[in-house]
Amino acid sequence: MCVPSQVRQIDKTTINFNINLNKQKTMNYPIGKRVIVRTNRAGVFYATLSDFDAQTRIAELKDCRRIHYWEGACSLSQLAEEGTKNPDSCRFSMYVPVMQVMETIEIIPCSDKAIKIIEGVEIWKK
């Protein structure tokens, strides 16, 4: 059986929970920085992040390369932080001036070291 003090406690918890759900956290996206972007279906990209809409998950990219295949890093996190140890084995596409990608899953800022290595990878074409 519920006593009135328990009911009030439950109500306060519910109210606090709902208030916390309604608070929106403001994210600072690395606009203007070189990033690696992973999408749900379009793949992985290296680019300058021009804009990002968190509600639609659409990222606008500038000077963009598709990362088709890489070796020399175990993950995109390592690639963004350290670059690749095997640049000759990587398949990075030609640059595209502007691109929009949907269903963005990850935006990983690149370190200066990684930028230098990634931009040194030769363009892969067939």
Each predicted region: which residue ranges?
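Conserved RNA-binding domains used in RNP assembly and mRNA/RNA metabolism
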Residues: 24-126
